[in-house]
Swiss-Prot record:
Catalytic machinery residues: E350, H381, K503
Catalytic activity: alpha-D-glucose 6-phosphate = beta-D-fructose 6-phosphate
GO biological process: gluconeogenesis; glucose 6-phosphate metabolic process; glycolytic process
SUPFAM superfamilies the record matches: SIS domain (SSF53697)
Organism: Burkholderia cenocepacia (strain ATCC BAA-245 / DSM 16553 / LMG 16656 / NCTC 13227 / J2315 / CF5610)
Cellular location(s): Cytoplasm
Chain's role: Catalyzes the reversible isomerization of glucose-6-phosphate to fructose-6-phosphate.
EC numbers: 5.3.1.9
Name under which the protein is recorded: Glucose-6-phosphate isomerase
Involved pathway(s): Carbohydrate biosynthesis; gluconeogenesis; Carbohydrate degradation; glycolysis; D-glyceraldehyde 3-phosphate and glycerone phosphate from D-glucose: step 2/4
Pfam families to which the protein is assigned, alphabetical: PGI
Family the entry assigns: Belongs to the GPI family.
Signal peptide limits: none
Isomerase keyword on record: yes
Length: 540
């Protein structure tokens, strides 16, 4: 049965026509918002977090029908299959067991293997943090460079930045991902090779960007005096292909394993998170895992009507497939969460930016929305104008951390006030009549410019404090949201074939850039012309 033929989908279409012009302002009006209030009904705790869904264009019937859609689409069955280690990535014939990386149950899949690798990580991290692991001249490590791309970069970078307040001040962590040499060059300007440890992270250990940077970094060490037989003091590898790591020149004892049953964008909980563990310590890393496990349990045990990942995913479908929203915004009012939007871009769009159903037929409905964002309050001075007064409706996830993780506590009420006021303003708007009063006598022409449509939907996620445990729960919340949406859309969120074609053609173009001549029959005229211009520039 296809999505559009499900009874709940048909019922939602009828319900949408009934509710599409309803005003949030009216639902919140005192005469309508009686106990239990709308905020009380639609604010739901889970996994140590809380979500206020009340400023969304939903009512109790919307939630009932969306939950029925989840049941009809098999969300519970697919969730349980994922946790059980069944094949939920059929195009690659793999399980998706990122949840096993933070499971505490000894009966969880691969528990012994995961525990052993984490213990090895902890031993190494403690040695680096304590100074007992030194560089080739005996100096302690003061800089860690994580080289990886995609899931081997975005997750660890996001977490290390978010948990800066609990990280050791003795070690600076740097992240290099781009094959553009400027990325690595800028980091190398800041570090001393005698005090630097490189973590090379690649599932296959053949990734173009990662291996290009790794080779350049190895050459840099040697050029600055590190003997080749001492590179083992400065290089470790994280991969599902240990043989290739050793072939690169990294000592076998310095190889940490990841597994093919963990997708890259879900892998920060594994040895891919070694840079996190070195920065914050094994105990705090365990807290990060514990928070994710809290959300895993909530996802498995909470009824769908009170289940944060389920509701977050279903409300996203409500806007994407019924209101026709093409993008959605993540606005963390926390500078510590600066990299969360870019992390979620990969998690959401690489997972659910698909057109092929699980049975190989193609969808006739939209899937992943464009995911974007910027921390508050910066975004208010960039794109919030469009959110408030533009013709396009963009659903928003606000994320508010209620207590600061820094000593400048007097800033925090201002930050929270802006977050809450933005959600209120987007919901309320300002009518033309109200705008006329604001404009004042004799300024009637200004009034239309002072109107706000309002009725703009937002969810506010509340985090008491940005502890490692709370951060783990927040990340897992979005991981599971992605699964919920993928299940309803009947797509595979665990592969990423869309990145392959460009990589294949990229090798052809790279060869042509250094060839004596380019066969115009190999490419379209635009690509041929671009190659020729680049060839001329590279020869200068």
């Amino acid at each position: 049965m296809t999505l559009k033929s499900l009874p709940a989908w048909t019922a939602l279409q009828s319900h949408f026509e009934q509710i599409r012009h309803a005003r949030l302002r009216d639902w919140f009006a005192p005469e309508n918002d009686r106990a239990p209030t709308r905020a009380e009904r639609f604010t739901i705790p889970g996994g140590g977090l809380a979500a206020d869904f009340s400023k969304n264009r939903i009512d109790d019937e919307t939630v009932r029908l969306l939950v029925q859609l989840a049941r009809d689409a098999g969300v519970e069955a697919r969730r349980d299959a994922m946790f059980a280690g069944e094949i939920v990535n059929p195009t690659e014939g793999r399980a998706a067991l990122h949840t096993a990386l933070r499971a505490t149950d000894p009966q969880a899949p691969f528990h012994a293997q995961v525990s052993a690798e984490r213990a090895k990580m902890a031993t190494f991290a403690r040695a680096v943090r304590s100074g007992t692991w030194t560089g080739y001249t005996g100096k302690r490590i003061r800089h860690v460079i994580n080289i990886g791309i995609g899931g081997s970069d975005l997750g660890p970078k996001m977490v290390v930045h978010a948990l800066h307040h609990v990280a050791t001040p003795e070690i600076s962590t740097h992240f290099v991902s781009n094959v553009d040499g400027a990325d690595l060059a800028r980091v190398l300007e800041q570090v001393d090779p005698e005090e630097t440890l490189a973590i090379i992270v690649s599932k296959t250990f053949t990734t173009l960007e990662t291996m290009t940077n790794a080779r350049s970094l190895r050459d840099w060490f040697v050029a600055r005096g590190c003997p080749e037989d001492a590179l083992a003091k400065h290089f470790v590898g994280v991969s599902a292909n240990p043989a290739e790591v050793v072939k690169f020149g990294i000592a076998a004892d310095n190889v940490f394993e990841m597994w093919d049953w963990v997708g890259g964008r879900y892998s920060l909980w594994s040895a891919v998170g070694l840079s996190i563990m070195i920065a914050v310590g094994p105990e705090q890393f365990d807290e990060l895992l514990a928070g994710a496990n809290d959300m895993d349990r909530h996802f498995r045990e909470a009824p769908l009507e009170r289940n944060l990942p389920v509701l977050l995913g279903l409300i996203g479908i409500w806007y994407r497939n019924f209101f026709g929203s093409q993008s959605y915004l993540v606005a963390p009012y926390s500078e510590a969460l600066h990299y969360l939007p870019s992390y979620l871009q990969q998690l959401e769009m690489e997972s659910n930016g698909k057109s092929a159903r699980l049975d190989g037929t193609f969808v006739d409905y939209p899937t992943s929305a464009v995911t974007w964002g910027e921390p508050g309050t910066n975004g208010q001075h960039a794109f919030f104008q469009m959110l408030h007064q533009g013709p396009t409706i963009v659903p928003i996830d606000f994320i508010a951390v209620l207590t600061p993780e820094h000593p400048l506590a007097s800033h925090h009420p201002k930050l929270l006030a802006n977050c809450f006021a933005q959600s209120e303003a987007l919901m309320l708007g300002r009518t033309l009549e109200e705008a006329r009063k604001v404009a004042g006598p004799g300024k009637e022409a200004l009034a239309p410019h002072l109107t706000f449509p309002g009725n703009r939907p937002t969810t506010t996620l509340l985090v008491d404090a940005l502890t490692p445990r709370a951060l783990g729960a927040l990340i897992a919340l979005y991981e599971h949201k992605v699964l919920v949406q993928a299940t309803v859309w009947d797509i595979n969120p665990f592969d990423q074939w869309g990145v392959e074609l460009g990589k294949i053609l990229g090798k052809v173009v790279e060869a042509d850039l250094s060839a004596e001549s380019v066969d115009p029959a190999k490419h379209d005229s635009s690509t041929t012309a671009l190659i020729e211009r680049a060839r001329a520039a590279l020869k200068r």
